[in-house]
Amino acid sequence: MEVKDANAALLSNYEVFQLLTDLKEQRKESGKNKHSAGQQNLNAITYETLKYISKTPCKNQSPAIVQEFLTAMKSHKLTKAEKLQLLNHRPMTAVEIQLMVEESEERLTEEQIEALLHTVTSILPAGPEDEQSKSTSNDAAMEEEEPA
C-alpha cells in the first residue's frame, strides 16, 4: 500500500466509526471469504478499532451534531487539529481543554476556556463511559440517602 498524500484529510473518530461499521455491514451482506491472511488481519483491526471507538463519545454523535459543533467552533480561534481533538475526546474539564489546545495559557483566557467547555459539553453527547459513571454515582448517592 502506498500513501499518495498523507495530509489529504483529517477524519474524526465518528467518521472512522461510520466507515468501519458500513464496511462490516457490506462484508456481512456479501458473505466474503474470510480465509486469506490479509482478510483476517483486516477483520482483526476492524474489530479492535470498533471495540475501542464504541467506548468513546463519538458513538453517540451524528452528522448533524458534528456540523453543529464545527459551526459553533468558528467563533473560537482554534486549529483544525484542536477542533478534531475536542470533537473526538469531548473534554469535561478546563484542564482537559488546556491539554488539547496548544499554548492555551497565551491564547485563551479563563472565560474563553469556560465558554469553550460549555460549548463542547452542551453540543456533544456524553460517551458510554460517562453515562455509566453518572449512573454509578447516582446509584451510590441513592444508596447513601436510603435509611439502613
UniProtKB/Swiss-Prot annotation:
GO molecular function annotations of the record: calcitonin gene-related peptide receptor activity; DNA-directed RNA polymerase activity; nucleotide binding
Biological processes per GO annotation: defense response to virus; innate immune response; neuropeptide signaling pathway; transcription by RNA polymerase III; transcription initiation at RNA polymerase III promoter
SMART domains for this protein: RPOL4c
Record's keyword terms, sorted: Antiviral defense, Cell membrane, DNA-directed RNA polymerase, Immunity, Innate immunity, Membrane, Nucleus, Transcription
SUPFAM superfamilies, per database record: HRDC-like
Region of interest (Disordered), residue spans: 124-148
GO cellular component assignments: acrosomal vesicle; axon; dendrite; DNA polymerase III complex; neuronal cell body; plasma membrane; RNA polymerase III complex
Membrane disposition: Peripheral membrane protein
Similarity-based family: Belongs to the eukaryotic RPC9 RNA polymerase subunit family.
PANTHER family recorded: CALCITONIN GENE-RELATED PEPTIDE-RECEPTOR COMPONENT PROTEIN, DNA-DIRECTED RNA POLYMERASE III SUBUNIT RPC9
The protein's assembly and partners: Component of the RNA polymerase III complex consisting of 17 subunits: a ten-subunit horseshoe-shaped catalytic core composed of POLR3A/RPC1, POLR3B/RPC2, POLR1C/RPAC1, POLR1D/RPAC2, POLR3K/RPC10, POLR2E/RPABC1, POLR2F/RPABC2, POLR2H/RPABC3, POLR2K/RPABC4 and POLR2L/RPABC5; a mobile stalk composed of two subunits POLR3H/RPC8 and CRCP/RPC9, protruding from the core and functioning primarily in transcription initiation; and additional subunits homologous to general transcription factors of the RNA polymerase II machinery, POLR3C/RPC3-POLR3F/RPC6-POLR3G/RPC7 heterotrimer required for transcription initiation and POLR3D/RPC4-POLR3E/RPC5 heterodimer involved in both transcription initiation and termination.
Name the UniProt record assigns to this protein: DNA-directed RNA polymerase III subunit RPC9
Organism name: Rattus norvegicus (Rat)
Originating gene: Crcp
